[in-house]
């Protein structure tokens, strides 16, 4: 946590930035935009199938499959033009996933499910610009009070037909992104800070919370991924900033957005922004 100097406070008041109606992020002098952060992907080789699977031919909603668990498998997403499909498998209370891409079929220990059911999304795109398309999968792995977590997987097909998963690392949106967040306090105002951007979070704070006990902000347990495809654009990350203070878990006060890029086995978050929620 940092205290805003009187000069900055005066500047904000003179320019009208102190008004309660202000919703946009404010510019913080003497700072620079948050720099991109990167981390290596979590690499997993797809397993050869351990049994002969009778693959379903029709796509069903994940909720429908959950309601009729008498069926051990379900096709949850497909890309007909690329001859690719994503399957969920249940056996003896264990779950795993199958990815079929042309003549390739591999098992992965991917999670999916709820209690909030969010359907997996599947794309085929040359994400890293190497001239070869990859399968892109976003699957929902966690939900609950203050929790909404999705995973991002980029799968490459190797020359021998095997499939390799490059997963977006949790540490990038948890530890690394959290380290860029901060709070700034004036006499009666509290701001969330990301690079040169400020968001007034005074009204988002619990009534009985003393801002002085704030250690800062973290990203909590919110991570979502989406794309602009088939239009131009890339992969988007959306998260949240929550209080780092004893007794206030998952108390979210601002939203975070960024773009995701992938190349050479490394993921990068760039164009980071902080927004009022």
What are these regions (language model features)?
Residues 1-8:
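Positively charged n-region of N-terminal signal peptides that target proteins for export
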């Amino acid at each position: 946590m940092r205290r805003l100097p009187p000069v900055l406070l005066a500047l904000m008041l003179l320019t009208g930035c102190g008004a309660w109606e202000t919703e946009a992020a404010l510019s913080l002098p003497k700072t620079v935009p948050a720099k991109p952060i990167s981390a290596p992907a979590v690499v997993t080789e797809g397993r050869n199938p351990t049994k002969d699977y009778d693959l379903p031919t029709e796509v069903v909603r994940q909720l429908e499959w959950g309601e009729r668990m008498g069926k051990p498998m379900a096709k949850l997403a497909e890309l007909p033009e690329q001859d690719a499909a994503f399957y969920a498998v249940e056996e003896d209370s264990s779950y795993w996933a199958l990815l079929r891409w042309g003549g390739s079929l591999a098992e992965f220990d991917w999670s999916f499910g709820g209690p909030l059911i969010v359907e997996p999304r599947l794309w085929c795109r040359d994400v890293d610009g190497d001239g070869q398309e990859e399968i892109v999968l976003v699957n929902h792995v966690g939900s609950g009070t203050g929790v909404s977590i999705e995973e991002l997987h980029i799968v490459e097909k190797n020359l021998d037909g095997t499939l390799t998963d490059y997963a977006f690392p949790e540490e990038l949106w948890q530890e690394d992104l959290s380290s860029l967040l901060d709070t700034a306090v004036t006499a009666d105002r509290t701001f969330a800070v990301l690079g040169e951007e400020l968001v007034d979070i005074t009204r988002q704070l619990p009534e009985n919370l003393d801002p002085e006990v704030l250690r800062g902000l973290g990203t909590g347990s919110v991570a979502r991924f989406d794309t602009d495809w088939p239009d131009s654009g890339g992969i988007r990350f959306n998260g949240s900033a929550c209080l780092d203070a004893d007794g206030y878990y998952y108390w979210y006060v601002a939203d975070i957005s960024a773009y995701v890029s992938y190349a050479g086995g490394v993921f990068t978050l760039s164009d980071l922004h902080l927004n009022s929620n």
